[in-house]
Amino acid sequence: MKDIATPNRTKDIVEKYGFSFKKSLGQNFLIDTNVLNRIVDHAEIGSESGAIEIGPGIGALTEQLAKRAKKVVAFEIDQRLLPILDETLAPYGNVTVINKDVLKADVHEVFNEQFEEGQDVMVVANLPYYITTPILFKLLEEKLPVRGFVVMMQKEVGDRLAAKPGTKEYGSLSIAIQYYTEVETVMTVPRTVFVPQPNVDSAIIRLLKRPKPVVEVTDETFFFEVVRASFAQRRKTLMNNLSNNLNGFPKDKELLDRILTEVGIDPKRRGETLSIEEFATLSNALVLHKLS
């Protein structure tokens, strides 16, 4: 049997079931087995590993994962795809498809039911563009015990995740993801290897979870509030952004100026120039004056 991820096999499956693509679900099926293998290679899936997939579509990536992993669990929100997946994944007895929205599912419960304690598990997915960021944050913030993520996403979002200080892509998203993970751009993927073709190119991004966050902060919630406030208006200085947008901090520009100067950060700098370490230092100084 031919791999699912070929133009002809994908076309045959779609026509057989009369499947119509839903733009609202970001459905773009990958038709290049080489790209799928690059994804699975970088996930370093072994014969004892587990994999969580989100949005399996007709099972193209699922199939490649099932060939290598001990167990694959795939979340699929679209009920119309279930009979297709029943057929395409029939040769593989190590796949469980769960018809749930991963953003609403109790992922810890599923994880504990489907995987062995201490098993090496990766999230491997061709993520729908419109929910890439919410999915990553849900799984990171809920501290799902996975080794990391290898995910296909819109190239523009991938660039933001991997961005360095001082670049136009760098922002609160870069800091939030890099706080929890080491980010690596594996490859850019042209839009031509999808059916239907999206309007943008994609990238494969690998995120390996850090044993502990990259910086130590006194108050994690406040740290992210400082970061978000610093990027509220990109063209404004830190002084302006923090004095206008940092909730829970006194509206006292003199105090703010003094704290910034004490930690060695020029109040006239913009948020995009600060490293994650500088944000941690700043947050740890500001939190001492937070309104209770």
Swiss-Prot record:
What GO biological process, any one, is recorded here? Answer: rRNA methylation
Record's InterPro entries?
Answer: KsgA/Erm (IPR001737), rRNA_Ade_diMease-like_C (IPR023165), rRNA_Ade_Mease_Trfase_CS (IPR020596), rRNA_Ade_methylase_Trfase_N (IPR020598), rRNA_adenine_dimethylase (IPR011530), SAM-dependent_MTases_sf (IPR029063)
Does the record bear Cell inner membrane in its keywords? Answer: no
* SUPFAM superfamilies registered for this protein in UniProt: S-adenosyl-L-methionine-dependent methyltransferases
Give one GO molecular function term: 16S rRNA (adenine(1518)-N(6)/adenine(1519)-N(6))-dimethyltransferase activity
Q: Which reaction does it catalyse?
A: adenosine(1518)/adenosine(1519) in 16S rRNA + 4 S-adenosyl-L-methionine = N(6)-dimethyladenosine(1518)/N(6)-dimethyladenosine(1519) in 16S rRNA + 4 S-adenosyl-L-homocysteine + 4 H(+)
Q: Which Gene3D superfamilies match?
A: Ribosomal RNA adenine dimethylase-like, domain 2 (1.10.8.100), Vaccinia Virus protein VP39 (3.40.50.150)
Pfam families (alphabetical): RrnaAD (PF00398)
Per UniProt, subcellular location reads as: Cytoplasm
Q: What does this protein do?
A: Specifically dimethylates two adjacent adenosines (A1518 and A1519) in the loop of a conserved hairpin near the 3'-end of 16S rRNA in the 30S particle. May play a critical role in biogenesis of 30S subunits.
Write out the similarity annotation: Belongs to the class I-like SAM-binding methyltransferase superfamily. rRNA adenine N(6)-methyltransferase family. RsmA subfamily.
Protein name as annotated = Ribosomal RNA small subunit methyltransferase A
Q: Which organism is it from?
A: Bacillus cereus (strain ATCC 14579 / DSM 31 / CCUG 7414 / JCM 2152 / NBRC 15305 / NCIMB 9373 / NCTC 2599 / NRRL B-3711)
Gene that encodes the chain: rsmA
